[in-house]
């Protein structure tokens, strides 16, 4: 199973996180499948590769709680619902 998870980067007392698609069994700093975003909590900046995130979410990837909060703020889940077909 694949998760969208934060991967810590940066230096001491100055954490910066990458949002990555990674296998559940891998460690936090393990090999990721793809880098799909960036989050800097100090400067409060985010960069999201929305097409890549939507691809992994459509394939069944589960975001962690923190990543889910970041995606909600960016309104990525609204785009996910728009891409899904409607059934009558």
Curated annotation (Swiss-Prot):
UniProt KW keywords: Chloroplast, Plastid, Ribonucleoprotein, Ribosomal protein
Induction field: Transcribed and spliced in green leaves.
Disulfide bonds: none
Superkingdom per UniProt: Eukaryota
Keyword Plastid: yes
One record GO biological process: translation
GO terms of molecular function: structural constituent of ribosome
Compartments it resides in: Plastid, Chloroplast
InterPro entries associated with the record: Ribosomal_bS16, Ribosomal_bS16_CS, Ribosomal_bS16_dom_sf
Chief place where the protein resides: plastid
This protein's GO CC annotations: chloroplast; small ribosomal subunit
Family: Belongs to the bacterial ribosomal protein bS16 family.
Name of the protein this chain belongs to: Small ribosomal subunit protein bS16c
Species assigned in the record: Solanum lycopersicum
